[in-house]
Design a protein with these regions (language model features):
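Feature marks extracellular polysaccharide-active and adherence modules
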Residues: 158, 230, 261-263, 271, ...
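Acidic Gly/Asp/Thr-rich repetitive segments characteristic of extracellular carbohydrate-active
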Residues: 173-187, 197-236, 241-242, 631
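Predominantly extracellular beta-rich ligand-binding scaffolds that present long acidic/polar faces
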Residues: 240-243, 255, 418, 461, ...
Length: 684
């Protein structure tokens, strides 16, 4: 379990030495006169830095930090850095200097900005926001020279240390201000193309003279291009085929993907409302058949079919939103018959529509409209002959007309990790389609209303592969007595469910007999309602009331309820993500006295290659266990199962902390002072 950290207390005196809540360095002394070829620690006026490929040189009468190609300099540890400002000059024009931060002692880095540096005199300057959160108390900042030679000087970094006494905050966990940060840094752009809603086709795609046509930018893109979209609403233009669909046919490379991304701090919306006429139903918003694309921060709405249909491979769709489309928000795969898409190829060998990652995306209020409307549109789908290696990471789907996720007619394994789904199949959510589309005859709503549907058989054959759901949540799917939260849907090849939670569904879990016992496993899951388990092996799960048959049995915790959670309210589930894409931090978390704390086992995840690859690629998925065992369900609590007491940083000299009630709230008491769960001192 994750211990409460009080680094703000431990860093109080160290941070105060920077003075005026700022960190400064002007490189006037102690830099080597020649650049070291390996990482070297140097003591400067501001503290110990780490450098490689940089040295001190006189420029315009003052010492500067001189950086050769790929040289870098790393600051000392900083507490909650805010604005990073510095001066710069280069040996030529168009040089690039990347600025990154690390919150894990340099194991991983997140780009916060890239400066374009010229040879102008006097020095230019750049300023980037770190967007620190309250837990970011040990942060490193790295400056990297992407093209030699660059001089930097006069670095100033504001510090927003939580070591200062601050009043308690009722709900500090939903930080939405600031530019969104991708889960890994964008690679350096080879070329940049700018779009803006008020741009023009006769512009040149620069920041000053942007285009406004996404298709125009895509056609001009080559590997390494960044298409940067300013905020506002775009209405895609009719193309030469008389359709509004934006087609992505060209490809990037593994090292140089083509990126379409939101301009920092802004949200571009691509509204395909011009498709919403009877004769255009079936036209998609974006159709991606190319490979190695990365879409970040886009909102796709009002497409006459899928918001995005993804058929290419090695693509990354991140922080995108899909809403009010006339079919599934984001769909991977082809059609019922694979050879219809690839004549002469009878089946997918795994390389088509393969290795795509869908990360931190939201999909809601999508609904198809025909004679039996609502029966096809899901939040997300990977179906009809997908390839290998497709994953959904930390996505949400709600209020879609059919299902939240649909893995119908799959050909290979599909993985879901920390995904949330709720309230599918409610007709009242989808009256909006009648404002746009008119159909003759008696229209009836036919949404199935299932949550996470992990399989399905149709005219294109039976679904194949072992499907995985790690730490996922499904709730509120109950439009009839037969709908389910997690549903095998007659899939026979097997499932692995670890750390999932289901409640308020007609059936929380439905896994019928006839599937693969050897490939079906349930570990550390929680069921607050009904289940029907007819296949597979189970261990370390929890249920409200044990089933007399067709239910979990081994190491089973019973008599659990919604009272075991801080919140299971939809309003909490819908709250904004943080700037890093993280989901709301109250929903689905256990209370301090839940019997599900320390009641599970981490052995299963640790032995699974699929899970180990996930946490290697996405370290934020890792569940850090510091108690005696894993908690049941999706999230680890910060409480001890036996005493409710945690210690600070495992220090033998540290005073114990206690969780106590104060003013009807749980707070932390230490040495007579009170702190909230962010480590901030509560001031009366």
């Amino acid at each position: 379990m994750r211990r409460l950290q009080f680094l703000s207390l431990l860093l109080l005196f160290a941070v105060s030495s920077f003075g005026d809540n700022k960190f400064t360095e002007n490189f006037e002394s102690s830099l080597p006169s020649s650049a070291p070829s390996s990482e070297t620690a140097v003591s400067l006026a501001s503290g110990q830095w780490k450098i490689k490929g940089v040295c001190g040189k006189s420029d315009n009468g003052s010492l500067r930090l001189s950086m050769s190609g790929n040289g870098y300099a790393v600051t000392p540890t900083l507490c909650q850095p805010g604005q990073v400002t510095f001066s710069h000059r280069a040996s030529g024009s168009g040089k690039k200097l990347k600025v990154e931060k690390s919150t894990d002692n340099g194991q991983t880095w997140q780009e916060i900005g890239t400066a374009t540096v010229s040879s102008s005199t006097p020095y230019g300057s750049s300023s980037f926001k770190c967007n620190s959160q309250e837990a970011d108390t040990e942060v490193l900042i790295r400056f990297t020279c992407m093209s030699a030679t660059i001089y930097i000087d006069d670095i100033t970094i504001t510090l927003n240390s939580v070591s200062q006494e601050q009043p308690d905050i009722d709900d500090p966990t939903y930080i939405t201000e600031g530019a969104w940060v991708p889960t890994k840094p964008f690679p350096t752009a080879v070329k940049e193309i700018y779009l803006a809603p008020d741009g023009a086709p006769n512009g040149d795609g620069t920041f000053e003279r942007p285009w406004n046509d996404l298709q125009q930018a895509i056609n001009a893109a080559t590997p390494g291009t960044h298409i940067i979209c300013r905020g506002g609403t775009y209405y895609p233009k009719k193309q030469s085929d008389s359709k509004y669909t934006v087609r992505i046919k060209n490809s990037g490379t593994e090292q140089a993907p083509i990126i379409i991304r939101a301009y920092d701090g802004e949200k571009p919306i691509f509204d395909f409302v011009n498709q919403l006429y009877d004769q255009m139903v079936g036209d998609r918003g974006l159709l991606i058949t190319g490979n190695h694309w990365w879409l970040f921060g886009l909102h796709i709405t009002h497409a006459a079919d899928n918001g995005i249909k993804l058929e290419g491979s090695h693509n990354r769709i991140e922080r995108c939103e899909f809403s009010y489309n006339l079919d599934t928000g984001l769909q991977l795969g082809f059609g019922h018959k694979f050879s219809d898409t690839f004549p002469g190829v009878s089946e997918n060998d795994g390389s088509y529509c393969a290795y795509n990652d869908i990360i931190d995306c939201d999909s809601h209020h999508n609904c198809d409209y025909d004679a039996n409307y609502g029966s096809d549109a899901d939040g997300f789908a990977c179906k009809m002959h997908n390839g290998k290696g497709n994953r959904f990471i930390r996505c949400r789907a709600w209020h879609n007309s059919d299902d939240g996720w649909d893995l119908f007619e799959t050909d290979f394994d599909v993985v879901l990790a920390e995904c949330w789904q709720w309230e599918s199949g409610k007709a009242a959510d989808h009256l909006w389609v009648k404002d746009y589309i008119t159909k003759s005859g008696n229209m009836s709503f036919s949404g199935n209303g299932n949550g996470i549907k992990l399989g399905g058989n149709g005219t294109g054959g039976s679904s194949k592969g072992v499907h995985y759901a790690f730490n996922c949540i499904a709730f509120g799917n109950n439009i009839s007595s037969s709908v389910k939260g997690f549903d095998c849907n007659n899939h026979k090849d097997g499932h692995v469910l670890v750390g999932c939670l289901a409640f308020d569904n007609s059936y929380d879990y439905m896994f019928e007999s006839g599937g693969s016992d050897a490939n079906t496993k349930y570990y550390n899951n929680v069921c607050l309602g009904r289940q029907e388990i007819g296949v597979g092996y189970d261990d370390y799960n929890a249920i409200a009331v044990a089933m007399s048959k067709n239910g979990w049995t081994n190491h089973l915790v019973t008599n659990v309820s919604q009272d075991d959670y801080l919140s299971l309210d939809e309003d909490e589930a819908m709250k904004p993500r943080d700037i890093y894409g993280g989901l709301p931090r109250k929903f689905g978390r256990l209370t301090y006295d839940s019997q599900m704390i320390d009641a599970g086992s981490s052995t299963f995840e640790e032995s699974m290659e699929v899970w180990q690859q996930l946490v290697s690629d996405f370290p934020f998925l890792q569940r850090t266990i510091q108690g005696k065992s894993r908690d049941l369900g999706p999230y680890e609590s910060s409480y001890s199962a036996t005493t409710g007491i945690t210690t600070v940083n495992d220090s033998p000299a540290a005073a114990p902390c206690r969780k106590v009630m104060r003013n009807a709230r749980i707070v932390i008491e230490k040495n007579g002072n009170y702190y909230n769960t962010q480590g901030q001192k509560i001031v009366d």
